[in-house]
């Protein structure tokens, strides 16, 4: 069990969605304020904590104690760690446990974990009794800067990533950066890919800052809070403009069309974490943009060098078991991309780049051009 730190001067980011607006509370030790904040938001509620075994070992007892101190009763549902829980079976397990715990519409589901737990618990909350409120307590860097914000919830299908889900906004997000100290180096690096994404899609100055400060972020220095807060502000602004992804919220999928296909082709396994797939996907998107004459080659080099400096995979050949299970099959990758949520009337849509800090939505991309590009990348490094 890990004891929560006391919080000092948290950063508050508002997700401005009218009656469904909520705060993202960021800082070292902010987990300690969870009970007080829930009591102020929803007096008299009961809660159900959904978490995974790894997170539970560090943070379940402290979280239960924080809730109890505020007079908030809680029950617990523990799932297995990893994408293997984001399935029909995983959803059934969580949903039935919530029903057995008699969680009512006015109660709260608390997602205590990384992106998998947040997506799974949020989707269960969305469909339970046609909508139960939930709180995100993200415990991974990826979840703190991306998946906990914006209301996307869901599970995977054998045919693709996040193909079943709902938009269901949390009522509160508690992003305690001290919790990130318990992540493995690989897990932390995977989340960093989503941080870099915000610089690439809309903030060149932030990307330049990341190039200079990534070591301090990784080691837990003061730069970490700034990186998380800047990322959350960027996402909150986009979500406030386009909650349902009918416009520029799609820009947040930079690297994800390639990345999701790579996750699917590796079986949603530990061979490729989501953030690692995004890292490779962003490099592929940059390279494809350059091939189309949209992005200067020097920008591609900067992107590759920065992600590699953090320790992220940047090429298809960096994926464990690259030569196995059809990873080297351009047609299979293209077929998986055809299941991407951005596909409209069977036409592929990609998020590409015109410069570092300027991403664009490219509609009706020629599949033959994508196939030729992938085929070339599969047979050479770089």
UniProtKB/Swiss-Prot annotation:
Alphabetically ordered keywords of this record: Amino-acid biosynthesis, Aromatic amino acid biosynthesis, Cobalt, Cytoplasm, Lyase, Metal-binding, NAD, Nucleotide-binding, Zinc
This protein's pathway: Metabolic intermediate biosynthesis; chorismate biosynthesis; chorismate from D-erythrose 4-phosphate and phosphoenolpyruvate: step 2/7
InterPro entries noted in UniProt: Dehydroquinate_synthase (IPR050071), DHQ_synth_AroB (IPR016037), DHQ_synth_fam (IPR030963), DHQS/DOIS_N (IPR030960), DHQS_C (IPR056179)
Cofactor(s), by name: Co(2+); Zn(2+); NAD(+)
Annotated GO MF terms: 3-dehydroquinate synthase activity; metal ion binding; nucleotide binding
Catalytic activity line of the entry: 7-phospho-2-dehydro-3-deoxy-D-arabino-heptonate = 3-dehydroquinate + phosphate
Compartments in which it is found: Cytoplasm
Principal location class: cytoplasm
EC numbers on record: 4.2.3.4
Positions that bind Zn(2+): 194, 256, 274
Biological process per Gene Ontology, one example term: chorismate biosynthetic process
Sequence positions that bind NAD(+): 81-86, 115-119, 139-140, 152, 161
CDD domains per the UniProt record, alphabetical: DHQS (cd08195)
Source domain of life: Bacteria
Cofactor binding, note field: Binds 1 divalent metal cation per subunit. Can use either Co(2+) or Zn(2+).
Cellular component GO terms, alphabetical: cytoplasm
UniProt KW Translocase keyword: no
Protein function: Catalyzes the conversion of 3-deoxy-D-arabino-heptulosonate 7-phosphate (DAHP) to dehydroquinate (DHQ).
PANTHER family: 3-DEHYDROQUINATE SYNTHASE, 3-DEHYDROQUINATE SYNTHASE, CHLOROPLASTIC
Family: Belongs to the sugar phosphate cyclases superfamily. Dehydroquinate synthase family.
Entry protein name: 3-dehydroquinate synthase
Species of origin: Bradyrhizobium sp. (strain BTAi1 / ATCC BAA-1182)
Protein encoded by which gene: aroB
